[in-house]
Amino acid sequence: SREIFNTVRTLEMMQENITSQNKKMLFIVAPNKNSLYDYMPSNYRKSKDKSNWERLSQKMSNVSYIDAFDLFRSKKECYYYKRDTHWNDQGAYLVVEKAMDLLGRPLLDQKEPAVFEKNAMTGDLQRMLYPDSKPNESKLVLSNPQSQMITTTRSFEQPYIETNQPNGNGSLVMFRDSFANNMITHLSEQYQYAIYDKNIPYNLSAVDKYQADHVIIEIAERNLNLIQEYKPLFLSL
């Protein structure tokens, strides 16, 4: 379709711009929960047509990306929260681990964080159905994080976050949505300086401004159309 073509071309132009500056770009589509797991209501019949992701991935030979769909389908465990639409902390860690591998920078800490905090959050589906619910989802928490927040950060839902890790390597600019909330802590441990930006359109001037070595673009499968609807600022005429 025209939308798929425009999305792919936008990503290609972003990557061309970024790699021309001797920097690396990586694209991540966060799968919809129902794209990976069963148990949808019986009145929702699964379409036999190819999904937007399937059609998109077939055209992205010139874009560096993580196939998070294959990554999660290759695992027996469920890596999404039970009462939330997002991947859980273990799932986020899997994606971060894969991203660092593809960017040629293995994780500084190879061990998955082991501190398990029960009832640390309330899932978005739970809040939708039962607004007064108490926290009922568990989270993995880094036992001894080295990174620090530069921006005043009350929540990872904030549209703009900056971090510093004195022992990290290089710098990162990440254009993201809420799926990256539980990626931020892990990524921030790897980079001396990192920026996480939820604003759309993507402002690629930040890549040069902050001398980013790596650029990660993460977006939910259900929001893929936003890439071709809101062209990155450097493409705007």
Question: Would you name each region that the model predicts?
Answer:
Residues 1-237:
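Extracellular glycan-modifying ectodomains
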